[in-house]
Amino acid sequence: MLNIYLSGEIHTDWREEIINLCKNDNLNISFSSPITNHEASDNCGVEILGKEEKKFWKDSKGANINSIKTRKAIKDADIVIVKFGEKYKQWNAAFDAGFAAALNKSIIVIHNDEHQHALKEVDAAASAVAKDQYQVVRILKYILEGSLN
């Protein structure tokens, strides 16, 4: 069984697409991901540990709590898939890719051609750079089954 961490943008259903496509192909994969509820992710620190007057400390508390899950999941992953969306700059996704690279994890990056130049260093650390979820699932199927179908 492969353990895969799904990092990246949280504004589309790309994770569910990959999970469902892999299920349809009966691929033996376990998936994990960050907290994708944006409001909960942003506010967990102050909701759990108390309010902050300055936004920096609010964000710091939330990021620190969220990093507990992220670090564990990336360390446990065989492959880290990082999706960069079209609308927002996903700094945390780039950080996850760097952390995964530092741990010598296999990385698959997803982004459109428009972001190629901005992500060239991230792409250089990746084992594969895909344009969409379908290409990712084909990679996973090939890795697990040796099949190109």
What kind of region is each of these model predictions?
Residues 1-149:
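Conserved catalytic or regulatory cores that recognize and/or transform ribose-phosphate-containing ligands
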